From Swiss-Prot:
Domain Carrier: 858-937
Family listed: Belongs to the ATP-dependent AMP-binding enzyme family.
Gene behind this protein: lys2
Gene Ontology BP annotations: lysine biosynthetic process via aminoadipic acid; secondary metabolite biosynthetic process
Entry-linked SMART domains: PKS_PP
Keywords, in A-Z order: Amino-acid biosynthesis, Lysine biosynthesis, NADP, Oxidoreductase, Phosphopantetheine, Phosphoprotein
NCBIfam families: AA-adenyl-dom, alpha_am_amid, Thioester-redct
Superkingdom to which the source organism belongs: Eukaryota
Organism whose genome encodes this protein: Penicillium chrysogenum (Penicillium notatum)
Official protein name in the record: L-2-aminoadipate reductase large subunit
Function text: Catalyzes the activation of alpha-aminoadipate by ATP-dependent adenylation and the reduction of activated alpha-aminoadipate by NADPH. The activated alpha-aminoadipate is bound to the phosphopantheinyl group of the enzyme itself before it is reduced to (S)-2-amino-6-oxohexanoate.
Amino acid sequence: MAVGTASLQDRLETWAQRLKNLTVSPLTRDYPDTQKTDSKRVIEAFESLQLPKAKLTGSSSSFIAFLTAFIILVARLTGDEDIAVGTNSNEDGRAFVIRVPIDTSESFAQLYAKVDKAYKEGSSQIVPLGSLRSYIQEKSKSERTPVLFRFAAYDAPASSQDYPANTFDTTDLVVNVAPGSAEVELGAYYNQRLFSSARIAFILKQLASIASNAAANPDEAIGRIDLMTEDQRALLPDPTCNLNWSNFRGAIHDIFTANAERHPEKLCVVETQSSSSPHREFTYRQINEASNILGHHLVRSGIQRGEVVMVYAYRGVDLVVAVMGILKAGATFSVIDPAYPPERQNIYLDVARPRALVNIAKATKDAGELSDIVRTFIDENLELRTEIPALALLDDGTLAGGSINGQDVFANDVALKSKPTGVVVGPDSIPTLSFTSGSEGRPKGVRGRHFSLAYYFPWMSETFKLTPDEKFTMLSGIAHDPIQRDIFTPLFLGAQLLVPAREDIQNEKLAEWIEKYGATITHLTPAMGQILVGGASAQFPALHHAFFVGDILIKRDCRSLQGLAPNVSIVNMYGTTETQRAVSYYEIPSYASNEGYLNNMKDVIMAGRGMLDVQMLVVNRYDPTRLCAIGEVGEIYVRAGGLAEGYLGSPELSAKKFLNNWFVNPEIWAEKDQAESRNEPWRQFYVGPRDRLYRSGDLGRYTPSGDVECSGRADDQVKIRGFRIELGEIDTHLSQHPLVRENVTLVRRDKDEEPTLVSYFVPDMNKWASWLESKGLKDDDSDSEGMVGLLRRFRPLRDDAREHLRTKLPTYAVPTVIIPLKRMPLNPNGKIDKPALPFPDTAELSAAAPRRASSALQALSETEQTLAQVWAKLIPNVTSRMIGPDDSFFDLGGHSILAQQMFFELRRKWRVIDISMNAIFRSPTLKGFASEIDRLLAMESFATSDDKTLAVQAANEPDDEYSKDAVQLVNELPKTFPQRTEAMLTSEPTVFLTGATGFLGAHILRDLLTRKSPSTKVVALVRAKTEELALERLRSTCRAYGFWDEAWTAKLQAVCGDLGKPQFGLSQSVWDDLTNRVDAVIHNGALVHWVYPYATLRPANVMGTIDALKLCASGKAKQFAFVSSTSALDKDRYVQESERIIAAGGNGISEDDDMEGSRVGLGTGYGQSKWAGEYLVKEAGRRGLRGTIVRSGYVLGDSVTGTTNTDDFLIRMLKGCIQIGLRPNIFNTVNMVPVDHVARIVIATAFHPPATGVNVAHVTGHPRLRFNQFLGALELYGYNVPQVDYVPWSTSLEQYVNDGEHNDKESQHALMPLYHFVTSDLPSNTKAPELDDVNAATALRADATWSGVDASAGAGVTEELVGLYASYLVQTGFLPAPTVAGARPLPAAQISEEQKKTLLSVGGRGGTS
């Protein structure tokens, strides 16, 4: 379609209006985004699917139909109703945005018409997307580049594997639609550092499912179109299966009684010492007898089954006695927390309508008697059968109830202490009444059932290895239903319950308490977990399981807990008061067993999957008869036999929330139950099997593993100024700020009654001082008690948090007010008490206005001390006391290998710290390097997310030192270079060669000396003490690589020198001789090191290049070949430019590129040194030099013999994959070329340079394998290395390194020297541009008349060559032999014993000789 005639400015304005207030939600991730910011994605992995056209009819096979299906899929996966995706013109392939509002009730055909119209309008007004972004950004005066779309679907008529030209940085997923004659191929490009291949494969199948289902029924509502496929269904719960509704395990109090009879003198409850009470211990017999007494009293008082008994409670053994006694009477226990205001206590009493009241003596002593308001309510509104005035279990185990009329209320019941009450209950009897929030502030009373209290404990015991020897904690809020877990779990197991004093439940002390008493199991809310770890330093290694319930659990808190309890496995349990014990679970293994597990988890821990006979059903919101497909947003329903009965006194609400299962006919369960009945006594209190679902109101998704992750509340979305805002999303991002320990966001009304976003946070004071120091600020703690003082003191942190949120959220979602608190107010249930959160008035905000900041305190940091300990551990003969702030890592004895090990240790110390290897060379002193770490810790200590990327970027500002240096070094070059018009090379040219003892250099030497026409003499620069030793080094190197002919010595001269010294360290006489004798210079030598900084490599790689050029400028005219590297182009800009060129039909980055794209910000010192070298050589070309710069990629083994350099990264990758038994899924192409072909190119360009000046010759592989193909060749030849996603592969590598069994030289992982590189983000790190190689081909064609071989078609590493290399490496002992018979046998590679011996003294890609 032709672009309209409107001006570009008019079209930009049209598009800006069209895309106003755009909703652009990302695809939910499988892994944390540790490397890229939210505004940047790298597309580097590929999946494909073929859909037979037979499943499509008519227009349903058109691109517009697939685009419509794609938009439906995006809507279903994100939950959005305003969809913007990228697409392209079917005429010229140019990209544009299509925006379509959707209604889930409209049909596919209706949406198709809307999409078709929007497509035609958009394709007729195309503007460059870069220009559109800039226009919108400038118009909105925003600091952030706008994101126009996260998803794109492109018309790719040639092939779905055509790399999409429009894979912009902000794209999560690109789908290419390539129609064929018999099938439509769908190809997906994605970033596997964020998304698993399993998720993408499911997405393609879902897209195909939408397309085929819509073809069959185009009038079906788009919200009802089925995304499910059989392979998804196999992973998800079956809502029609039997969940064993009738498998009642017995009443929890009867199980407790049986345990008491089996081991009566075993410790049951321990009340630990406090400042006001002694340490007290009670046995199972004492608790059993005491609860029997209470039970008999209640029965004698007329309490009937299911009647409520309210407990005015206190945390302690008395509460355990009260609960068990009430249950033994067949009654329902409920709890009032004395901390509640009297008015709220009355609400609970009004809802519960109890028939008995148990006052725990310690509660009345601590909080006072029931208030007059409560007492009046009881007298006027309740009909109590009995009241226990002061229940107390005395130190000797005697139970007291308090005196009435001069006699203890239990006086007539004590004689029955050894006898059970005999009250029978069943699975549908009501043992508990718990409260949860309700509308208009009135709580709902949830009636729990006996079925749930004991049903899941055997499964938990087996799954989590819980034994009778455990020590449980009693930390939950006493009126919060998780207290039931605290009490019932140990009593079921016959274990011990530890009760802390109130003073122990606070920061620092709680950790000390757990350590002191050796707790092994704890149940926590996330808020209580934050109290446990906040400010704590005590380690508690005995704790092996922590079960979290009640709120969202985030990775930061898990990491903090495992930092104190390395043996604790953390179990996140999703459930509600209404589901009772029927919950889902997701287990995080202990740090001791799997150090890196949390690294690859997202910030919010998923809900997981249902425990025994519990199902998490994510139901389609538009068609409840269907489960959601993987990744689709739906509402979470819990299906289980252990659900609560319902809400007390609210049958209508119960009917809305507790629903009969519509997926199955319930009659089948009744028939099964009747067949299994044995007329057990409890069946009289069982209404029969009820297949019910609890509607949670939470939104969620299935993950590719079949687990469930929560994605917010169906009702937790607020609108402010017309924008939809998810409060949970704000909280998630704010929690990732390193100094935020706790946080919560609310909507409050300001003075004008306008809704205002307010975030509250508790600063992490352990990091406050170092953070201020890193900012150059001083702590203003002169008045930090009141609101004004807190606002003023933490203003820098508030501002920083706001800036942090601006990088994560749209502007409208950034809270207007951010308030620091010393601690979060908690309600008695251990949750944040939101109504108690303060809101500052205008005067307070004004008084807290900023004051002048002062300089930061100068003090030795904790980071420096820790770092010194790490250095002392690694560097021989050094102790931490010997290391001062100005001591250098290298001066102390450190080197690059120890630096790699240091980074490994740092990751263990600080979990996932990710700092560039360059940092240690840039800042080698203790103080300097600690500062580098602090920059990252300021963004990393709680999260491995986008925040860390910002810190990495701040610590590694774009570096242009190398390019500025190159510009200055131009002054060192000769002004002119000699020229002549006759043939430059005679019949017997002399070539000066550097780097001849390296892998490539030796092969260049072989090629030169074996040429017949012309016969060539070689002068090789070798680092040695004498020319005899220099020649011997050349001889040994060649023998090691399988070639040497003693006859070569007649044409070979070795001269002693050093690249890093002026004039290569040659004497003036030798230098003068060379200037007059040499016809061509091949400058191949360099110091190759991937972590050394530019300054270290400069003498050999840059100044050495200047000396090579000076050699060319003196004496007779010479031709020049400079061996460079594609690392000089290692910038994202070149990858993007390459994609554009390929899409336009080109071959890749031109050899004529001016390198301006990498003038700033090259990441390695080696690449920087090669950039500077190239800059100087090109300038020499402008001054008269004739020559070529040869840019090579990976130089692999000889294509004939298989001789291979074992120090090469790719060869190390082969061995590393074999060592861990896995290979990563990396779709990038790899520019690999056999060494003999690279050598031929170098010589061809040296002998056949351009007529004038200097050009570039790219060394490009033909064919160019992908990483998957290269590593997959191992399986072809019998190595058992299945392919997995990169993140699991990286985790396996970390585990291999961490397990401590591979520290010796033989078993140390092959990738250890490159550990940081391969575990940071290998898919992105290995993404490289495609390269045009016209000049290389031209030189090879010209050389054919000399060499007799036309190699201009190029060469590359094939799967067959990988087999040859593997055979060679097996012969040398570098690789083990294949373990099974592969599809192909290893080719034969012959290697002599002499070669094996000489190989021990040779290595490296290129020497410094």
